From Swiss-Prot:
EC numbers for this chain: 2.8.4.4
GO MF term set: 4 iron, 4 sulfur cluster binding; aspartic acid methylthiotransferase activity; metal ion binding; protein methylthiotransferase activity
Name recorded for this polypeptide: Ribosomal protein uS12 methylthiotransferase RimO
UniProt-annotated binding residues for [4Fe-4S] cluster 2: 159, 163, 166
Cofactor(s) in the UniProt record: [4Fe-4S] cluster
Domain MTTase N-terminal: 9-124
Domain TRAM: 389-461
Annotated cofactor note: Binds 2 [4Fe-4S] clusters. One cluster is coordinated with 3 cysteines and an exchangeable S-adenosyl-L-methionine.
Native organism: Polaromonas naphthalenivorans (strain CJ2)
Domain Radical SAM core as annotated: residue spans: 145-387
Binding residues annotated for [4Fe-4S] cluster 1, in chain numbering: 18, 54, 83
Length: 461
């Protein structure tokens, strides 16, 4: 008698927004895969589509709503999760439901179990005798949506700050730090799985453990405080045997950050800090209600460079914030020239529904905001170009991201100064030695021979 083979249900997934949302998507897919669901790369090939949305700025809202519409048109069965799922429309009801009433379910961010329940309701899980007996078939690290050689490690969720331009706390809640043992176990599993670069992310990495009063956890039989310094020390120790990188993102410039600079200076973790400064003028920072707004950031950056001359600092800024005067904006330009931020991005301020900054008097015309953003980026690019030119002639370690024909025709990679997707790259020319090969996910030494925009040109050695 022929058995009727059960059709394996297939899930489509679109992940929009920041790396923190990406880690939520990875967790959802890991749990679904552990239950026997398969994934589809197309809407048409899926039995159901999950859209993980972003709702931070208006452009992100539009992109998320458009993507939901595309998924509905192509597939018809759509579950929505993420930050936009927590957003209300003009009449107070759920915005996604207003715009797309036919979606199957809507949840807010980091609502993994609610998404799982919605999937089970609309696409019952398959019975797989093997998977059913394996409670964690994909290991601690789970499924990753990044290339195999790098991964994001989320250490906390939410944020305790109430910056006037930001609505993330209203969508993701207050700070909740992951247990330090869980974080370190995931890190080790990722390294064991071949990850060569770990990118530590959260809404506020410097505040890790504040919510639990830095309580002591345990990992590998040893006590470890739930605090940024101890976490970074442990990550560096775990990474060392694998020759892997640890890169820190979203690090607010608190005095405690000084404690991790020796770890960077001695090579335990990458000498790279992603510090969201947003502005330099004290009055603008006060209107933004930025944490650490009273800190002397210029002095702090100078001290960091004294402690670790190789440090690369990335930051983001807002131009044209409500009430920003020309003098306040010039203060920001002077700060950029003096601080010499290695990698900088800038947004022209735009009103975000639900943000208290909307009530601050002095909204600037769009043309002024865009013009200031352009002026800022001209200064930032000049600083970056000068910094990049200083690397010409140096030999650097490069993590290979792309290497067709074993790299004999060249490829692309990144140095310690380049985070994936947001910074420049190292464009690798064909090696001088015919015997030299390169593989994706491996390190190579390369001599910097030129600069092209935000990128370096290098010859593998």
């Amino acid at each position: 008698m022929n058995e009727i083979k059960e059709k394996i249900p297939r899930i489509g997934m679109v992940s929009l927004g920041c790396p923190k949302a990406l880690t939520d998507s990875e967790l959802i897919l890991t749990r679904l895969s552990a239950e026997g669901y398969q994934t589809s790369k197309t809407f048409e090939g899926a039995d159901l589509v999950i859209v993980n949305t972003c709702g931070f700025i208006d452009d992100a809202v539009r992109e998320s709503l458009d993507t939901i519409g595309e998924a509905l048109a192509a597939n018809g069965k759509v579950i929505v999760t993420g930050c936009l799922g927590a957003k209300s429309g003009d009449n107070g009801s759920n915005l996604v439901r207003q715009m797309h009433p036919s979606v199957l379910a809507v949840t807010g961010p980091h609502a993994t179990q609610e998404v799982m329940d919605a999937v089970h309701l609309n696409l019952p899980k398959p019975h797989d005798p093997f998977v059913d007996l394996v409670p964690n078939a994909f290991g601690i690290a789970g499924i990753k949506l990044t290339p195999r050689h790098y991964a994001y490690l989320k250490i906390s969720e939410g944020c305790n700050h109430r910056c006037t331009f930001c609505i993330i706390p209203s969508m993701r809640g207050d700070l909740v730090s992951r247990p330090v043992g869980d974080v370190l176990s995931e890190a080790r599993a990722l390294f064991e799985g071949g990850v060569k670069e770990l990118l530590v992310i959260s809404q506020d990495t410097s505040a890790y453990g504040v919510d639990v009063k830095y309580r002591t956890g345990f990992w590998d039989g040893k006590p470890v405080k739930t605090r940024m310094l101890e976490l970074v020390q442990a990550l560096g120790e775990i990474a060392a045997p694998f020759g892997a990188w640890v890169r820190l993102h979203y690090v607010y410039p608190y005095p405690s950050v000084d404690e991790i600079l020796p770890l960077m200076a001695t090579g335990k973790v990458l000498p790279y800090l992603d510090v969201p400064l947003q502005h330099s003028h004290p009055d603008v920072l006060r209107r933004m209600k930025r944490p650490a707004s009273g800190e002397k950031n210029l002095e702090r950056i100078s001290r960091w460079r004294e402690m670790c001359p190789e440090i690369v600092i990335r930051s983001t800024f807002i131009a044209g914030f409500p009430g920003e005067t020309e003098a306040e904006f010039e203060h920001l330009l002077d700060f950029m020239r003096e601080a010499k931020i290695d990698r900088a991005g800038c947004f022209a301020y735009s009103a975000v529904q639900g943000a208290t900054a909307n009530d601050i008097p002095g909204m600037l015309p769009l043309g002024v905001r865009e013009e200031r953003r352009a002026r800022f980026m001209a200064v930032a690019e000049a600083v970056s170009s000068q910094k990049l030119q200083q690397r010409v002639g140096a030999t650097m370690q490069v993590l290979v991201d792309h290497a067709p024909a074993l790299g004999r025709k060249g490829g692309t990679g990144r140095s310690y100064a380049d985070a994936p997707e947001i910074d420049g790259v190292v464009k690798l020319l064909p090696p001088e030695k015919i015997s030299k090969t390169m593989k994706v996910g491996e390190f190579t030494r390369a001599r910097i021979v030129g600069v092209q925009g935000h990128d370096l040109i290098a010859v593998p050695v």
